[in-house]
Amino acid sequence: MTDTATRPVASDSVAGVGRIVRVTGPVVDIEFPHDSIPPVYNALKTTITIGEDSTEITLEIALHLGDDVVRAIALKPTDGLVRGQEVRDTGAAISVPVGDITKGKVFNVTGDILNNEGGEPIEITERWPIHRKPPMFDQLESKTQLFETGIKVIDLLTPYVQGGKIGLFGGAGVGKTVLIQEMIQRVAQDHGGVSVFAGVGERTREGNDLIMEMEEAGVFDKTALVFGQMDEPPGTRLRVALSALTMAEYFRDVKNQDVLLFIDNIFRFTQAGSEVSTLLGRMPSAVGYQPNLADEMGVLQERITSTRGHSITSLQAIYVPADDYTDPAPATTFAHLDATTELSREIASRGLYPAVDPLTSTSRILDPRYLGQAHYDTATRVKAILQKNKELQEIIAILGVDELSEEDKVTVSRARRIQQFLSQNTYMAKKFTGVEGSTVPLKNTIESFSKIADGDYDHVAEQAFFNVGDLDDVERRWSEIQKENG
């Protein structure tokens, strides 16, 4: 048995152990022995002791400064770190648990389980590093397939791609997070797939609400959640999306499952990158963003894809600062997306939810080659009616509806019915409205909007189309309205 006194003592001469030479907020400079400088992205560990409390923190190497000094970003607050303190090189990048063990669990960026206090210790059998290469070109799936959501406005006008990247754009308070929660519910119910949720720089309260709602809906056990919230250091917020994506990749590549990856909010990912870039001393680019914004975004987005027969479909909430779509953060994200769902403050103010703007939302598969001629023709007609109505609004505001031609009056009337019919009861809104959510099959959606555009329902009052599922609901509502009016 080795005596304690003869054991090696950690010092500057021991490989894999360095000493802190500088602490500037979340940025820590560490000097290592010349022959054992760890590579960029390696995880380092050290312990902060304040009084009787000890906390282990993880740091990730971001730069080699020269003179045997590396610069690392701390993933927890650095209060209590001192110069000369020892830091251990783990010899590998940050890694997270993968596999079925992740379902029904809440993790932080380094893969620690957050919702197992007082429970039995959970054995982690496999971990993957969060920095991984995207699939090779010859491994990618070449077929394009529609991802049906059961939400009318999305399926008809901005159809999602199986294995694609979808952006939910909108300012504060227009319903991005609620729509993401709705999609988690629908995927669990209708697709039976696995969901992975990345909470990137959002409010802790929202994360808590999401977990409680998922437990109530019975979908929590099919979802892995990874959180790096608003109050955490920028290094955590920058890496948490990669931690969640790594868990999703395991289900796709090893379990051969289709996965839905939710990221809320991708703007906070960009914002964290900007903070880290500034802390590392890089010269800022346009509007103060990091000079490697496009590169950082590409590293994340290129890993979200379909391989042969299996897919990761990503739904990303994207906050638009001051509703400015030319801001570099949302503008850089646009290039990677297969579909964009823009949430409109004006539509939300009229009480029409989901508040999707049908004229500015887009999808690359809104094409007869992918959807069929009937779907494409119906979507095109609906958009044409809504666009014509938008053009006529200025005339109506000045002269009134009575000054329009008979043809234009019919167009405006049908457009109003279409606008009302694009609203829909959602499962997540039941607690506010008291009305059960509805799922509308794509075939019904196409037929319904085609009939409204043809004028088959011109005799039905506009209010009968509000917040309903299909035309059967409209007819039922219309009968009730007629009875009430005698």
Curated annotation (Swiss-Prot):
Gene Ontology CC terms, in alphabetical order: plasma membrane; proton-transporting ATP synthase complex
Residues annotated to bind ATP: G170, G171, A172, G173, V174, G175, K176, T177
EC number annotated for this UniProt entry: 7.1.2.2
Entry's localization field: Cell membrane
Entry keyword set: ATP synthesis, ATP-binding, Cell membrane, CF(1), Hydrogen ion transport, Ion transport, Membrane, Nucleotide-binding, Translocase, Transport
Listed InterPro entries: AAA+_ATPase, ATP-synt_VA_C, ATP_synth_F1_bsu, ATPase_a/bsu_AS, ATPase_alpha/beta_chains, ATPase_F1/V1/A1_a/bsu_N, ATPase_F1/V1/A1_a/bsu_N_sf, ATPase_F1/V1/A1_a/bsu_nucl-bd
Domain of life: Bacteria
GO molecular function: ATP binding; ATP hydrolysis activity; proton-transporting ATP synthase activity, rotational mechanism
Signal sequence extent: none
Gene3D superfamilies: 2.40.10.170, Bovine Mitochondrial F1-atpase, Atp Synthase Beta Chain, Chain D, domain 3, P-loop containing nucleotide triphosphate hydrolases
Membrane protein topology class: Peripheral membrane protein
PROSITE patterns, sorted: ATPASE_ALPHA_BETA
Broad enzyme group: translocase
NCBIfam families the UniProt entry points to: atpD
Family: Belongs to the ATPase alpha/beta chains family.
Quaternary state and interactors: F-type ATPases have 2 components, CF(1) - the catalytic core - and CF(0) - the membrane proton channel. CF(1) has five subunits: alpha(3), beta(3), gamma(1), delta(1), epsilon(1). CF(0) has three main subunits: a(1), b(2) and c(9-12). The alpha and beta chains form an alternating ring which encloses part of the gamma chain. CF(1) is attached to CF(0) by a central stalk formed by the gamma and epsilon chains, while a peripheral stalk is formed by the delta and b chains.
Function in brief: Produces ATP from ADP in the presence of a proton gradient across the membrane. The catalytic sites are hosted primarily by the beta subunits.
PANTHER family: ATP SYNTHASE, ATP SYNTHASE SUBUNIT BETA, MITOCHONDRIAL
Annotated protein name in UniProt: ATP synthase subunit beta
Record organism: Clavibacter sepedonicus (Clavibacter michiganensis subsp. sepedonicus)
